[in-house]
């Protein structure tokens, strides 16, 4: 991966908890030497807690729709070091997000479906307090 790009791994376990998922994923990532290129995210605060307990240096983010819900989970003690809201659900003023890493996502199309065709206005997102974005089509921004 390029130095300024990270790969987000979303742990899809907020409805059904998969025993040992976090351990297996960390083992796989470390076996390939990719630990510095990965961000782990989940809607499950417990899953983020487990990742952080297993690897205190792991980059993690708590997912939710609204940024206020992400912040609520973070302050609940999940140990995430970033907020991962939907980019269209920035319901707090940017000054409330000062000091936080805010990696926003969208529900855009996934490869190999037809490309979305547009580009996000990254400057406008930054003005809302977003520091990073998850993209299904990162090649459009290179």
Provide a role label for each language-model segment.
Residues 3-142:
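Short loop-to-alpha-helix "cap/lid" segments that border enzyme active sites
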């Amino acid at each position: 991966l390029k130095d300024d790009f990270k790969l987000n791994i979303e742990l899809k376990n907020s409805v059904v908890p998969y025993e040992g998922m976090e351990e297996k994923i960390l083992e796989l990532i470390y076996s390939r030497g990719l630990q510095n290129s990965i961000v782990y995210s989940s809607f499950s605060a417990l899953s983020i807690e487990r990742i952080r307990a297993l690897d205190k240096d792991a980059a993690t983010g708590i997912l939710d729709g609204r940024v206020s819900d992400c912040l609520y989970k973070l302050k609940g003690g999940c140990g995430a070091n970033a907020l991962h809201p939907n980019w269209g659900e920035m319901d707090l003023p940017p000054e409330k997000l000062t000091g936080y890493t805010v990696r926003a996502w969208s529900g855009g199309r996934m490869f190999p479906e037809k490309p979305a065709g547009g580009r996000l206005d990254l400057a406008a997102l930054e003005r809302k307090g977003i520091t990073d974005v998850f993209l299904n089509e990162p090649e459009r921004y290179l």
